[in-house]
Amino acid sequence: MNNKMKFMCTALTASLFLAGCGNMGGMDANGLLSAGADMAKAANLSDADIVQLSDAACKQSDQESKIAPAGNKYSKRLTKLMRGFGNMTLNGQKVNYKVYLTEDVNAWAMGNGCVRVYSGLMDLMNDDELRGVIGHEMGHVALGHTKKAMQTAYAVSAARQAAGAAGNSVVASLSASQLGDLTEKFINAQFSQSQETAADDYSFDLLTQKKMNRKGLVTAFQKLAELDGGQSSMFSSHPSSPDRAARMQQRLDAGK
């Protein structure tokens, strides 16, 4: 994920509730209770809830983005390089992918199998490097990191809006503005250092399993290091891009 993507749910309800109170002047007690209930619900979102929210958030993002059409050079290239992964599923969800036409250098994946790659990233990297990055993003889904990020995005959106219609569906409980806020929070989330490292390893192991070139992970981080001066990466500020490149090279040298 970009150097925006990372949240954690530790002490979530208390910290978000207190942080949000300063902006809740004039809200009645029922409104505050509703916000607290939504935040508590976020920590207990089921896998089915995550898929449902991801479906809605991905659709929202697609509507707000310029998607490369099927005949576009970026779409053709992504389709070709994704063939190496075969019929991938993430936690039982079939992977679906699209390209956003934007100069931003980014990519992300959601719990419903939604994978989105930005053309700015595709301009920067070759196919092996892109497979490494995409494998990393899919790793966040497979390892449960995106579930935590979606739980937090849901809680933050509920806290900011402090409202939501009653209903059985977590999506139905969100207004259109809340859904937009949730989508933005998820895409701009950040993962912990340990999660980023685990996603790197997932991608390396996936590329190994699929018999694809793992060197792309090394050179992808090297390019990001040049892009950001070696201080951070599109995924995270910790560990740094050079450190991650070196770690992947060590795994290559060790033959595992």
Regions inferred by a protein language model and the residue ranges of each:
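A Zn2+-metalloprotease active-site environment signal
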Residues: 2-9, 16-256
